[in-house]
Amino acid sequence: MLLILDAVGGLDYAATNQFSYDNPIRVTSNSWGSSGPFDPMNPVNIATYELYKRGIVSVFAAGNDGPGEDTHNPYAQAPWVVSVGASEKDSVLTSFSSRGKRGEMGTFTMPDGREWTYFNQPTIVANGVDIVSTRTLTGALPATAAEQDANGIAPAHLPFYSHMSGTSMATPHVAGIVALMLEANPHLNPAQVKDILERTATNLTGRLAWEAGAGHVNAYAALAEASGMRNDFGGTVNTLREFNSNALLSPGGDPVPFSILFTPVGEVEDVTFEVGPEVAWVAARATVDNTIAVVLTDPDGVQYGSAISLPAIGSTVVAGGPGKAGTWKVTVRGIGSVSGVALDPLGATNGYAAPGYVDGQVTFLNSGGYTGLDDIGGHAAEKAIEHAVAYRLVDGYSDRKFRPDQHIRRRELAQYLLMGSTIRQQLPLDGTPSFTDLDVDSPYYAYAESAVAGGAPLRDLAQDDAGVMGLYNGQFRPNDPVTRASLAYSLVQALGMQDQAVAFSGDLTVFHDGQRIPLDDAGQIPAALRGYVQLALDMGLLNARFSLTQGPFDLSPTLHARFDPTERVTRGGWSVAAGRFMTQYQVAQD
């Protein structure tokens, strides 16, 4: 009771002293909370409602009890407050950020007679990991924080500041953005502030509303909207639109652990496991201090390889693919080359890596059914399409068809990249379109503008990379098909890896069974896209095609690989690539 009264007392102070300063109090930052169900008559919620009626925005931490469902701070669920989840600096929702509850909502009436509807989900997400914040002079620091502080904070500031993580660190970021919005436009009321934050948000890859609300906060767009420079943001936000297709996935059975001994020569063991017909997606994950890749093989022999654990890519590797009933295998392989230079040109080893055990686990997502996808049953990409639809990486058409074999158009690719690749929505502040061949009234216009904007991926921390899609002689060409080479560019660019792609030199190869196989059609890949194709292959975003040839006197066949850079990507093919992209993107979550 004392804690509640103290909290309410702080909110009461803001109301009582709102006009006691040169500038009125317009926003409160609340890095505290509780647990349990939302109750509009709770004293804290009544207090924030009074602040709302006085024009004061209450910003609340969503809580640090994630990733489980229904762990959301009940004070953050009030529809008149802004609830803030936490992201990491590489733009993934952090595991500790509290989640809402899928589908939970309710209506209620406050004592003043006004009816409200609440949704058990965060409003927005902001950076909340490894943030430099004030500390008490007497509090002891964990050893890891003390070491991090010594490396990143000036000695004179060490007694007063430390690195901290939590939605408590994310909340002040949003409160500060709200303050800037109100400075730009003091006439905004709390409902308008919340609306702008949601309409200008960035969709987070593979995260739904109950987990991350509208997505990642976009301070630049929020200020542009608040100041009246634009008033039409929101066309790309997943939570603000209706989808033609829907699918529901749920966690599958218990994870299958594996511990595989890698040896550079000889047979490398594999672990087999069974997958049922209800499984929509299979993923194998390992964190290794070695140049190792994880390889999944489905019952038909189709392989799904992870990225290779390298400093430029990261130490956590994940391989994923659409579910298929039967016996699967998981194994590991070493790297066959670095930057195009073969490490084992004779193919006598399992790839280059130190011997040792690789520990990880295989996880599953089960199908819960889908709607608006009447033509995908039995298609080779059915499970991948279902997975992509469930995580808002793709959508079907209004006639309940998906058309998996139809070529994807550039306007659709722009839409799907914005839906599921953590790309900021950007619109020209001077009102002048970046191209003239797509009308500003088109539902695809905002997607296309954002796709060609520089610095749009949140992974591009310097915000200086080129757009995830390009223009052709100043035109967007929305109806053009998408080739595999151009898709490689878009996916790698969305990961913020422009510098690595541009710096690549050497032969184009694909990793297969511990070896690097040269691409027979490497000469067909434009020089500017070679590094993008190589990274897309190395990270398992796109696959190569293999074949065997054997001359009349050869003792054994020769394995060949090609990329088919000019081949047009189908909508089913995009769904597979989008699922792999999501798997790779979320590897960064600590």
Listing of model-derived features with the role each one plays in the protein:
Residues M1-L5, Y21-R26, Y52-G55, Q77-V81, ...:
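Subtilisin-like serine protease catalytic core
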Residues M1-P40, G85:
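Subtilisin-like peptidase catalytic core
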Residues I25-S29, H157-Y161, E183-E269:
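C-terminal subdomain of the subtilisin-like protease fold in secreted/lumenal serine endopeptidases
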Residues A76-A175:
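Extracellular S/T/G-rich loop segment that most often corresponds to the catalytic His/Ser-adjacent loop
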Residues E211-A212, A224, L261-G305:
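Acidic, Ser/Thr/Pro-rich low-complexity intrinsically disordered segments
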Residues F233, L240, L296-Q303, G320-D374:
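C-terminal edge strands of extracellular/lumenal beta-sandwich accessory domains
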Residues T236, Q361-D590:
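N-terminal propeptides
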